A protein has these predicted regions:
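Acidic, Ser/Thr/Gly/Pro-rich intrinsically disordered interaction regions
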Residues: 2-55, 62, 69-183
Length: 183
């Protein structure tokens, strides 16, 4: 619901468009990384940037998956440019995982998020689904060669551990920009 402010008279804090969310996600990732790498780290600023980034990430994921589902329902997805864009390898995943492995990823501490073993590459479409079904309070990250890598725990619908996935936030945004052109 993009423009709900008319209902309450208050300005909406919801993202207005996919393009805006992509822009904001890229920017907040940079702000987060800079705050985290300061000496001493600026945890307040990093936390604020992270919260803002998550709102934009969720908006992007929901909009792209909704558009995909609409195209599937209309019979216009198979063979489309959107399908091609979503089939690009864009993240990594380690599966199956145990609860202990998911807990260890968090226990490693902020900035030390890693997959517990050899990963397989996953498509942007699969990554979007992993992001959608992530533990919202169970994520980590690392800064690697000035890149912000987001690491997430994912469960199956029955709440059993499914996987741990990771992606480079900047690369994710670049590929979502391409996919958004074909929604």
């Amino acid at each position: 619901m993009g423009h709900s402010s008319y209902l309450t008279g208050a300005p909406s804090s919801e993202p207005q468009s996919i393009e805006e969310s992509l822009y904001e996600l890229e920017n907040t990732s940079v702000l987060f990384r800079e705050a985290w790498q300061r000496v001493p780290p600026d945890f307040v600023r990093a936390s604020r940037a992270s919260a803002k980034a998550m709102a934009h990430l969720d908006h992007l994921v929901n909009e792209i998956l909704r558009a995909r589902d609409t195209r599937i329902a209309r019979g216009t997805y198979a063979g489309s440019q959107l399908e091609a864009d979503l089939n690009i390898m864009r993240g990594k995943m380690f599966a199956p995982v145990t609860v202990a492995q998911q807990q260890a990823m968090i226990a490693a501490g902020p900035g030390s998020g890693n997959l517990p073993g050899d990963a397989v590459q996953i498509t942007l479409e699969r990554l979007l689904n992993k992001v959608k079904h992530r533990h919202h309070q169970s994520a980590n990250f690392r800064i690697e060669a000035s890149r912000h890598i987001f690491v997430i725990n994912v469960d199956r619908p029955n709440k059993m551990p499914d996987s741990i996935a990771e992606f480079d936030v900047s690369d994710f945004c670049t590929h979502c920009i391409q996919a958004a052109k074909h929604l």
